[in-house]
Amino acid sequence: MSVASFLTGEKLLAGSKFVIGKYNVTIEKYIAEGGFSHVYLVQTNSKTDGSPITAVLKRMYSPDENALRFVKTEIETMELLKSNPHVVSYIDSCIFPLEKAGVNTGFEILLLMEYCAGGGLIDFMNQRLQTRLSEHEVLKIISDIVQGVASLHYLRPPLIHRDLKVENVLLSFNTFKLCDFGSVTEPMHAAENSSEIQALEKSINTFTTYQYRAPEMINLYSGLGIDEKSDMWALGVLLYKLCYYTTPFETQGPNAILTASYSFPPFPPYSHSLKNVIIALLQPNPCLRPNIFQLMCEICRLRGTALPFRDIYSGRESSFYDLHNRKIMSLLRQTTTTPFAGNQVMPTPQVQGSRPPPPPPMPAPIYNVPNVPTVPTVSPNPFLQPTFSGTSQASAHPSIHSQSATFNNTQDVNRQSVSSPKVVSSSSVTGSGASGRKVYTPQSKNPFPISQGVTGTSSKFSASEVTEDNGSPNAGLDADNVDVEEVVNQRYPDLNELESQLTSHTNITTSSHHNPREQEIAKLADDAFASFRQTAGTSTANSTHTTGTQDISAFDTNFSEGVGSVRSSFDFPDRPVSRRPSSTSRSSVKITGPSSPNARSMAYEQHSFNLDDLSNTNFGSNNSLRHAKSFSKYYSPSHKDSNKTSRNTSKEGLPSSPTMLYRTTSNTRGDYIVQRTQQSANPLTNIEPQDMSNLSTDINASDVVADSTNSILYPTSTASSVANTIASDVDDFGTFNGLQRTVSLHSERASLDKKRPSFHDKNPYFKFSPSKYVDEGLEGESELRERVRSYANRSSSSFHNPDLTDTEIQETSFNNDLRPVASIQSAETSRSVSDRPANFPEELNDTLFEQKYPGIVDYEEPNSNAEKNVNI
């Protein structure tokens, strides 16, 4: 084969035969081509046993030895990862030199690999062009891809793919596999001079795709190395494209990538949990992006599956939400700090109004790891080189404050710009201790304080240090074969180190002279830390955790009952609520309703009950901690139009309310049954619905209408969330990383007026600490209790609904058996509705009645002299 025929696109004919290693190959058909490669479907027969195999032949061309080196890297990488089920399997390969007139003109490489009958991921996405991918499918695809990327990141030294995109993912028997390892390389240090920058820029332009490049690949003067976190950014872009069939920066320039300026389209709708993963991955600061294990933890939590591999990043938490909090606080620091001179030391900030720093994390235990030689410590920052060693690792960390002082103010609260490196300090950073002091000399300036000790050619590990029993390099994901765990504190900042950046801030709520940017930043900072406190369900002795079960987050829980369920967790401190499984925790409250044929035939999905005066409740000192923007209306697109979706049910005798509070179903008798499902572990999101079956008075539809201002509040999702069959009610509740990005500061939340908080708004900025709530209760609780008691103790004369006319309600009274009966008369029909069947024998006592008809309570005469016991 000549070079000219290869470069002019001449393809191999069907039936052509080759010998590649130990396989006889016959060309069947041409599949696709790349820049310097052709792909064919072939049939192979092993020379040893003659077994036929359908495979793929990738025919590549390299003009010189330097280009051949990258092809060999691809072959060696595939051979190293051939046991991973989420990587396209390597079969065999061979290299032929090409000559013309006795002169070497390049090399031809034949790579034989696994055939994926499902085609490419891009073909699978095109088949769903109209309906798009469901959230379950998106999580399945990204889970397989992450496991393939983890096989690279878990090698020692780690490898980065550099060209992660949907075009490099194939489908084989319901498994998505990673392919095209021609861009694989080891982590690279930041370029320090113009020649290195030019060489790095050429390499990036050759081996990466522009829309998937991380900010550190765009701004080569930022002083940031290119490592595994660059792959994490590409995974965020890939995940975004799986959801919305476009990249987040498709129509924007490089500045959009540098500042992570993008938005989420309204269609298709996905849960906030999935959007949070995208937001965490697309962070301009590599420190704030999760590592591959943290990403896998979040995906497994959303899917409800077990982790497929262990955590080698010792000393770090699996949740990256706390790291995202640091970004919010760094934005706050930009407006509260002033620039420092080059030789001036930044004072240590005093944190006020926030939680104290957590204790230092304990090192993760290492099980079944043999004794290994001690690995010499290296500098925690690749851009600061030690002159000699001798201090502890804790004292080796340079000051993080001076490094982060070069952050630039941006025009958007959800953006961080990558600036050119600036001189922070001309003095050296020294460690502590009288002897064995380690002195660091700044080599290059980094606007993001990423501590990375394993970059380029690894200073900690070599390929020979971690091997299999047969002498081959270890693939990295087998827990039993990991001999050395990485000390991640040498590579990335510790959580305590990041939290030390927090600066003091005052109560912005009572100040009116702050500009809109400061108000928005303060609100985000307050809400981020107030929303993620320890939940009440896990902070008490009653909390349990079963090994092997899904860890349900109190702020993002997918209930098995799905959309249409009533979520309840308003547990008053003095009355413990028993936690039962969802199959047994269902209770119903019978409400006698309108008896018209329309009412019986209609499928009432929602009823509107409102508690207007609940918003007038004084919430005490917690109210002063909230910014004015925290009182805004629905912040997410799935809730902002709930006022427009309210069903007008006034013609059926039910009030029209702007808030959809809970859903009911109608049985054959025309009764509306309010169903409760399993209680949520989060007391912030919902109020515990009252068990109306324990009240000492029955409730009918007219009473609810008459006393709508004293009704109990049942939060639920809106009609727009019902349309999304993927996202549950809890997924619609936004966490702090659910703050959706916009292209300008003038977001939808900034334009809303201040309003009092209410539970049914499902306000994501509701700021009561779960632990404080359980210990002290909620202010205004006594008023709620008294209101329920007064409702239960009303006399029969108070059962009158002023909203219904005399022609609609003829009378409301109690019969001799003290059974509430509401006679509702209309032009169409008139019938009497009772809570007991019409043929119920009167000689049966209450006990037999309750046994035969569970859930229907026979009420007794209200006694004004006796105190009513009402369970709240």
UniProtKB/Swiss-Prot annotation:
**Highest taxon listed in the record's lineage:** Eukaryota
Q: Which residues carry this modification: Phosphoserine?
A: S472, S596, S657
What is the protein name for this chain?
Serine/threonine-protein kinase ppk29
- Pro residues bias spans: 355-364
**Pfam families xref list:** Pkinase
Region span, Disordered: 339-479, 565-600, 633-664
**Which portions of the chain have biased composition (kind: Low complexity)?**
365-382, 417-436, 579-589
UniProt binding sites for ATP: I31, A32, E33, G34, G35, F36, S37, H38, V39, K58
Entry-linked InterPro entries: Kinase-like_dom_sf, Prot_kinase_dom, Ser/Thr_kinase_AS
Q: Where is the Protein kinase domain?
A: 25-310
Q: Say yes or no: keyword Transmembrane helix present.
A: no
Q: Give the location in the cell.
A: Cytoplasm
Gene Ontology BP annotations: actin cortical patch assembly; actin filament organization; regulation of clathrin-dependent endocytosis; signaling
Q: Which GO terms describe its molecular function?
A: ATP binding; protein serine kinase activity; protein serine/threonine kinase activity
A cellular component term (GO) from this record?
A: cytoplasm
Active-site residues are D163
First-listed, main subcellular location of the protein, grouped into a coarse class = cytoplasm
**Residue spans with biased composition (Polar residues)?**
384-416, 452-473
Q: What does the record give as EC number?
A: 2.7.11.1
Q: What is the taxonomic lineage of the source species?
A: Eukaryota, Fungi, Dikarya, Ascomycota, Taphrinomycotina
Keywords of the record:
ATP-binding, Cytoplasm, Kinase, Nucleotide-binding, Phosphoprotein, Serine/threonine-protein kinase, Transferase
Q: Report the family membership.
A: Belongs to the protein kinase superfamily. Ser/Thr protein kinase family.
Q: Reaction catalysed by this chain?
A: L-seryl-[protein] + ATP = O-phospho-L-seryl-[protein] + ADP + H(+); L-threonyl-[protein] + ATP = O-phospho-L-threonyl-[protein] + ADP + H(+)
